[in-house]
């Protein structure tokens, strides 16, 4: 059912990965990623005040039991060399274990090592949510989920000044590289769109207190 698959992708019911690790059935409390949550909002759990939530997911990863010359090459390659994402880069020392992390607002909030033998583990992680946050699961750099948004007191997520500043610079850089290639008849409209994007990130920056 291609239409159903495309709709799920649009709603965020997916994750990014190299195919050698997987995170399935990711939920925060009873809200699943890519599914309607509080007040019907996709991937959103609304809390009236700070409190504890439960993060639940199934996770599996597969590493060769013993390293080879090729897997060592992958593991030791620079991050700007292919393959950029590969489970071998996650191997802990000479073991067959990899780290699973729960991320809150871009920071590691919880970490556990699992055996990367292909078996599926069901994990439940209690977390204290102090402010509106996005929550995701990863084995980096092998798999990363889309986020579940947890709002507190109906406040927006304002995770990081550095992130907002990076986005502003990214918009500016993109325009400096792409703007000259846009047809003159369309350039003013395009510039307006870029300026609007930049203004959104500037507003987010002004509302953010955390670095």
Language-model features: where?
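C-terminal functional module detector
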Residues: 1-211
